[in-house]
């Protein structure tokens, strides 16, 4: 949700010689409703090795956020390497050629900052936030972590134990297990989209230092990296620091993967001691580069966003079947998911599933409530505009757009397309969800009664 480009020429001769395809973007999301001081601009540039720079100037903020996004995650792993992106991210903080683990922490905290990271299906990201004047130092620190991590063997042995504890927490949580099984039901085990980001215990125990070095050398290349900053920015200082830190990074080739094929089906896991049945059910949705995904986003908001939505009103308020239930979409670079989830008492799980099916059929067969559709549009609009005011959300969204689309989306164009989705298109979404040719994916975890399992197997038949 970001603006289109307008021409920009950098001022520094050094930056001019090392950057290309540089643009300025006006990202004021509504000049009629925003104070002028809150308007923002976005600049894009590319180093000679293909690494992209993204700068979102937010002059009213007192701090600056910096992230390095790498286009590699669990989607880019073979079954044998499943989990290695997550391990590399953990180990990146354990030392470089010039900094040990403690020195990384001290150098960040001496600036009042804190480094962090996360691994996702389609990317890995490293973050730091602090004072604007320290941005060049932040660039140098994250570059050292990304480019020069040494993955010490003794640290790897210790970190295995930490990740084993992470596995235990994950496997004790019905919500986490339900979503892991849901992905497996959607895409099967043969495609990386159906495998968990955390990997497998066997893989984590087998990976050695050579595996991590080889993976980072292959995947962490300039054509797969975006260095992104948001806050009150001196663009030339940011560009010079990035060029100095990253210009020697090998260009490499884009990390590409094939789109998964939807499978559907039922997965269940009984977990001793659980007092809840966690249900996740969903359907195939378009990927980010297909604008028809907007109708799915609007349909999900209509059905299950907010306490007044039909899903929460029926499931929680009228029937008391679940404390938490929601309908969302996960629109990714290769595929999307239309997801309904809920935590319910085991004795009520069967009724919960039946009620969800009835709501979907009601929206597929009947008319779409105009008031509810208007409510959903407003909720999505406010959510999108609020995200523009949050640096970390802005950077994450922009990086995903650049990796997936190759350009940034203009907020007003995205919102205009959302407004243009008709009630008929939303109803068609619900009708397609119930198409037996593309069966639902369903996962139940926790305390799973036999009747709920049987009901799930017969849903949407």
Where do the PLM segments sit?
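Charge-rich, well-structured scaffold segments of protease-associated domains
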Residues: 8-11, 15-29, 46, 101-260, ...
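N- or domain-start disorder-to-order transition segments that initiate the globular core
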Residues: 24-63
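Short, surface-exposed, low-complexity cationic segments
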Residues: 61-72
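His/Glu-based metal-binding/catalytic segments typifying zinc-dependent metallopeptidases
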Residues: 67-69, 253-310
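Short pre-active-site segment immediately N-terminal to the catalytic Zn-binding motif
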Residues: 73-81
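Active-site SXXK
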Residues: 83-96
């Amino acid at each position: 949700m970001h603006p289109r480009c307008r021409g920009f020429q950098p001022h520094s001769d050094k930056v001019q010689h090392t950057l290309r395809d540089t643009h300025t973007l006006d990202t004021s999301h509504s000049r009629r409703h925003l104070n002028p001081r809150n308007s923002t601009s976005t600049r894009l540039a590319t180093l000679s090795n293909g690494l992209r720079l993204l700068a979102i100037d937010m002059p009213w903020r007192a701090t600056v956020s910096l992230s390095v996004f790498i286009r590699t995650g669990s989607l880019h792993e073979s079954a044998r390497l499943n989990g290695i992106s997550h391990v590399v991210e953990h180990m990146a903080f354990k030392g470089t050629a010039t900094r040990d683990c403690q020195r990384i922490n001290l150098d960040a905290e001496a600036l009042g900052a804190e480094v962090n990271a996360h691994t996702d299906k389609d990317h890995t990201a490293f973050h730091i936030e602090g004072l604007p004047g320290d941005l060049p130092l932040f660039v140098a620190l994250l570059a050292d972590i990304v480019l020069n991590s040494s993955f010490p063997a003794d640290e790897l042995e210790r970190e295995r134990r930490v990740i084993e504890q992470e596995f235990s927490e994950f496997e004790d949580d019905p919500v986490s297990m339900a979503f892991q099984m849901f992905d497996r039901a959607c895409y099967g085990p043969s495609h990386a989209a159906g495998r968990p980001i955390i990997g497998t215990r066997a893989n984590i125990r087998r990976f050695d230092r050579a595996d991590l070095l080889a993976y980072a050398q292959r995947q962490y290349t300039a054509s797969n990296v975006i260095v992104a900053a948001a806050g009150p920015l001196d663009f030339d200082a940011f560009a010079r620091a990035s060029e100095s830190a990253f210009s020697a990074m090998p260009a490499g080739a884009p990390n590409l993967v094939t789109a998964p094929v939807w499978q559907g089906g039922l997965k269940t896991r009984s977990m001793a001691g659980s007092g809840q049945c966690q249900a996740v059910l969903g359907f195939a949705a378009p990927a980010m580069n297909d604008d028809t995904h907007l109708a799915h986003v609007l349909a999900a908001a209509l059905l299950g966003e907010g306490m007044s939505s039909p899903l929460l009103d029926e499931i929680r308020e009228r029937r008391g079947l679940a404390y938490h239930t929601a309908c969302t979409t996960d629109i990714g670079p290769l595929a999307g998911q239309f997801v309904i989830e809920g935590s319910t008492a085991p004795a009520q799980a069967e009724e919960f599933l039946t009620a969800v099916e009835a709501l979907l059929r009601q929206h597929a067969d009947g008319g779409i409530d105009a008031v509810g559709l208007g409510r959903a549009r407003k909720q999505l609009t406010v959510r999108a505009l609020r995200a523009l005011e949050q640096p970390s959300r802005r950077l994450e969204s922009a990086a995903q757009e650049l990796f997936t689309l190759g350009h940034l989306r203009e907020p007003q164009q995205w919102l205009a397309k959302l407004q243009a989705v008709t009630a008929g298109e939303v109803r068609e979404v619900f009708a397609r969800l119930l198409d037996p040719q593309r069966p639902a994916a369903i996962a139940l975890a926790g305390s799973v009664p036999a009747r709920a399992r049987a009901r799930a197997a017969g849903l949407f038949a």
